[in-house]
């Protein structure tokens, strides 16, 4: 059934726009150039407003997810990477549940990637329609069918651009992947802005700067009571404070520390005697994939809950899924879940909220740890990084594990890889929860994604440097 499903969608995949693989080795400086061009296009799209929208001043229902999904409200990047990640989530779950089967052949892998792209385009259209019809840009009846269709087309084209930019980097023209690049850029931009924003906001305590660092100097300069000014700068509510900034730096350091944890399995060449090496199995074996997929799951649950709340606000089942309230609190207006399933799957707003509702905290922790471990464990089966796949790669390189025959390598790798994947996912979830509770800027999930992505780029840089033999050879 699985192979038949992939064969059924094969004709549709053939007509999808595709980036061809490079016919020659792309030099590092060219990769840097293509990566910079990709990032520039993304940032430009983040600033171009959607044509035809009547209003985007209402409370933002996806405010809490925008940093993670690299989206920007009211612009071409309204959907961000959500369609790509959601399609990956769906395909992974289908493959993990054996509803579709993905073989080891390049043909099956190509069909699987094509199916993921096809679903990504379908989801883009679906999300665009939902956003327009739920009144995010104004009353659809007042805007008219023509304007509604125009907004949907703009969102679809922007979604297609994101898909192609991601594929451009994935095919080897650039560094890393588009998804990782866009997420890291968005999160780092948010952290820098929250730390140094010159925007002034009128609070009950008077006019204050949004940026935590600028606010420190402003409060010290304008307040007569310097001790109270310091206290406000470190602990002020509803705006970024210095404790948030310190928590962010602390989480950065902790994640980088854990990146170095790994188990090295001794391997040797089957052809040349005396040639020894090691195969590293990292603690974060699946890197940031679990948290990306978990974010996609939650964001889509938010979309469904918001859509139903707008239309059927008094329905018992809809309220069971999620109840929403608008919050301003000194920043942009946003919607936040205050009841139902969505409330329990979202992080507590503050330390006070943690003490007020411990059940919420317990459910949130269990959900984060469980979902990250599950996604990490199932991801290795569909991404070509399971024990069977690693054993096959080592065999192709004519390498074997010391003290083991070819036939027993899979069994030995199975002792480490699934455990590393599940435990690594669990640790990713735990670090995300810790960052949320400490109040890190950009959310725990966002910080975790930023650090792991930046570390990936550091590893790519080191690898490229080792291949060409020096820093100067990379660029000249």
From Swiss-Prot:
Pfam families listed in its UniProt record: Plug_translocon, SecY
Top-level taxon of origin: Eukaryota
Subcellular location per the Swiss-Prot or TrEMBL entry: Endoplasmic reticulum membrane
Membrane-spanning parts: 33-53, 76-96, 118-138, 145-165, 173-193, 241-261, 289-309, 354-374, 421-441, 442-462
Topology feature Lumenal, residues: 54-75, 139-144, 194-240, 310-353
GO cellular component: endoplasmic reticulum membrane
Gene3D superfamilies: SecY subunit domain
Protein's membrane topology: Multi-pass membrane protein
InterPro entries: SecY/SEC61-alpha, SecY_CS, SecY_dom_sf, Translocon_Sec61/SecY_plug_dom
Keyword line: Endoplasmic reticulum, Membrane, Protein transport, Translocation, Transmembrane, Transmembrane helix, Transport
Residue ranges that the UniProt entry lists as topological domain Cytoplasmic: 1-32, 97-117, 166-172, 262-288, 375-420, 463-476
One BP annotation, GO: protein transport
Subunit and partners: The SEC61 channel-forming translocon complex consists of channel-forming core components SEC61A1, SEC61B and SEC61G and different auxiliary components such as SEC62 and SEC63.
The protein's role, per its UniProt record: Component of SEC61 channel-forming translocon complex that mediates transport of signal peptide-containing precursor polypeptides across the endoplasmic reticulum (ER). Forms a ribosome receptor and a gated pore in the ER membrane, both functions required for cotranslational translocation of nascent polypeptides.
NCBIfam families listed in its UniProt record: 3a0501s007, PRK08568.1-5
Family per record: Belongs to the SecY/SEC61-alpha family.
Name of the protein: Protein transport protein Sec61 subunit alpha isoform 2
UniProt source species: Pongo abelii (Sumatran orangutan)
Gene this protein is translated from: SEC61A2
């Amino acid at each position: 059934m699985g192979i038949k499903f992939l064969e059924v969608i094969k004709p549709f995949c053939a007509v999808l726009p595709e980036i061809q693989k490079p016919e020659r080795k792309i030099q590092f400086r060219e990769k840097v150039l293509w990566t910079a061009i990709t990032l520039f296009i993304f940032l430009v799209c983040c600033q171009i407003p959607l044509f035809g929208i009547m209003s985007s001043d209402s409370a933002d229902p996806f405010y809490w997810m925008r940093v993670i999904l690299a989206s920007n409200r009211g612009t071409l990047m309204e959907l961000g990477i959500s369609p790509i990640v959601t399609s990956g989530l769906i395909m992974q779950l289908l493959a993990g549940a054996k509803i579709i089967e993905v073989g080891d052949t390049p043909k099956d892998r190509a069909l699987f990637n094509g199916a993921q792209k096809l679903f990504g385009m379908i989801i883009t259209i679906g999300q665009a329609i939902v956003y327009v019809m739920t009144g995010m840009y104004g009353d659809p009846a007042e805007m008219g069918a023509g304007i509604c269709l125009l907004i949907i087309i703009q969102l679809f084209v922007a979604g297609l651009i994101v898909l192609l930019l991601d594929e451009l980097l994935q095919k080897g023209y650039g560094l890393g992947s588009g998804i990782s690049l866009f997420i890291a850029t968005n999160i780092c931009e948010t952290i820098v802005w929250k730390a140094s924003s010159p925007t002034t906001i009128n609070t009950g305590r008077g006019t204050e700067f949004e940026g935590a660092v600028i606010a420190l100097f402003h409060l010290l300069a304008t307040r007569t009571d310097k001790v109270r000014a310091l206290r406000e700068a470190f602990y002020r509510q509803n705006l970024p404070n210095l404790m948030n900034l310190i928590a962010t730096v602390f989480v950065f350091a902790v994640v980088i520390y854990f990146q170095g944890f790994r188990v090295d399995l001794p391997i040797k060449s089957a052809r040349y005697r005396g040639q020894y090496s090691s195969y590293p199995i990292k603690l974060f074996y699946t890197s940031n994939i679990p948290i990306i997929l978990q974010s996609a799951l939650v964001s889509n649950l938010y979309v469904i809950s918001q859509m139903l709340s707008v239309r059927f606000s008094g329905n018992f089942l809809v309220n069971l899924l999620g109840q929403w309230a608008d919050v301003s609190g000194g920043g942009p207006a946003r919607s936040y879940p205050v009841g139902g399933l969505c409330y329990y799957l979202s992080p507590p707003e503050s330390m006070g909220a943690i003490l007020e509702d411990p059940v919420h905290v317990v459910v949130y922790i269990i959900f984060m740890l469980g979902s990250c471990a599950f996604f990490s464990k199932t991801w290795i089966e569909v991404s070509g990084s399971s024990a069977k796949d690693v054993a096959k790669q080592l065999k192709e390189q004519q390498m074997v594990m010391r003290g083991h025959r070819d036939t027993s390598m899979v069994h030995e790798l199975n002792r480490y890889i699934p455990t590393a994947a599940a435990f690594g996912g669990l640790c990713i979830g735990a670090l995300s929860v810790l960052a949320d509770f400490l109040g890190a800027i950009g959310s725990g999930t966002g910080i975790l994604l930023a650090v792991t992505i930046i570390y990936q780029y550091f590893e790519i840089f080191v690898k490229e440097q080792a291949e060409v033999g020096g820093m100067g050879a990379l660029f000249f």
